[in-house]
Amino acid sequence: MAVTITWVKARQIFDSRGNPTVEVDVGLSDGSYARGAVPSGASTGIYEALELRDGGSDYLGKGVLKAVSNVNNIIGPAIVGKDPTEQVEIDNFMVQQLDGTSNEWGWCKQKLGANAILAVSLAVCKAGAMVKKIPLYQHIANLAGNKTLVLPVPAFNVINGGSHAGNKLAMQEFMILPTGASSFKEAMKMGVEVYHNLKSIIKKKYGQDATNVGDEGGFAPNIQENKEGLELLKAAIEKAGYTGKVVIGMDVAASEFFGEKDKTYDLNFKEENNDGSNKISGDSLKDLYKSFVSEYPIESIEDPFDQDDWSTYAKLTDEIGQKVQIVGDDLLVTNPTRVAKAINEKTCNALLLKVNQIGSVTESIEAVRMSKRAGWGVMASHRSGETEDTFIADLSVGLSTGQIKTGAPCRSERLAKYNQLLRIEEELGDAAVYAGAKFRAPVEPY
């Protein structure tokens, strides 16, 4: 007798920012059950699939009871009796038939909500692994047709700016990547040591309150110059003794400070009495990145331009794309249609993989396979509003993304993912391979 889904239960829980989010349990005919919880972002791309919120006054409009109801009353009853190992079939059924809404970029989940569909998709994926009696990462690898498992390089977001922090810093994330480590375990050691060295440098320079942490566990010192963030990282890496072994990554989240009207980028956008004197063109911003890259060991720049500024993206990718990966997040929103366009137009050369931007495991896998076949890098990612769910840790190994960013080594909802990766590496034993310097292309495309 094949094991089937016998019940589905959704509930409203809370993310790491105290905002409601969706959690789903999927029960099986053998008496077991699996659980999935979805995250949510602060700086969201306008092309992301719909995250259904209730509106009204409860929870300041951020309740998810409609999404919960959609799972309990529409999706749940419709998937009872199905085989949880049939991920593609269940995802496509939810996305294309039960929801069925689409726009020019594909299935947009406007009816049921990407948060409702994804919570079920995650729980079904975990249930499928349980039924097959294999680890979740192996089940994901099998679904994708990936034969080689690789542990990702962690990209620790240790200095926060942009929409994640109350300082004046325009650029959102300054990250460290221990590419010179020989294992994930060693990468954690390097990351943690740089983080603690950074903390003492910031405390000494800016005072105790500058070491308060942001949504993702990074520090948010009150600095204005983006270059100062890079200087701090360089100093911390040096102090920890890892120069040459730990490189730098940035997530600029430039859509947050792009002016639609005059098509300029305002690096002073968080200043109260902003007179607009710091507005620059896309080309000037591109040159600023090139100067950063020549001065600092930067190997990854995410969302360097606005989500609709395809042409400036392509220029930067053409000019420095060999040396540095140019990652599309708001640009691509993990959407296979947008990924195809970017591959075609050589807009960027890496995908930021956020399952909740597209809303199903199957579509996420499709976006990753397309990216890898185009020779792109892939970085699996958390959201700023996270839960204790560790799905993306298994996802990054199962798809051999080569990279994962899930915050600083601080705050339990961030460490939950890193700790799961430590367990996976331990479980793989001698078969464990760490991406290291090959983080942009850790495996042959599958």
UniProtKB/Swiss-Prot annotation:
Binding site for substrate: 164, 173, 302, 329, 381-384, 405
Keywords: Cytoplasm, Glycolysis, Lyase, Magnesium, Metal-binding
Molecular function GO terms recorded: magnesium ion binding; phosphopyruvate hydratase activity
Organism domain of life: Eukaryota
Annotated positions binding Mg(2+): 251, 302, 329
Cellular component aspect of the GO annotation: phosphopyruvate hydratase complex
Cofactor note: Mg(2+) is required for catalysis and for stabilizing the dimer.
CDD domains, A to Z: enolase
UniProt-annotated catalytic positions: 216, 354
Major location (coarse): cytoplasm
Gene3D superfamilies assigned to the protein according to its UniProt record, in alphabetical order: Enolase-like C-terminal domain, Enolase-like, N-terminal domain
Subcellular localization: Cytoplasm
NCBIfam families: eno
Listed PANTHER family: ENOLASE, ENOLASE 1
Name used for this protein in its record: Enolase 1
Biological classification of the source: Eukaryota, Viridiplantae, Streptophyta, Embryophyta, Tracheophyta
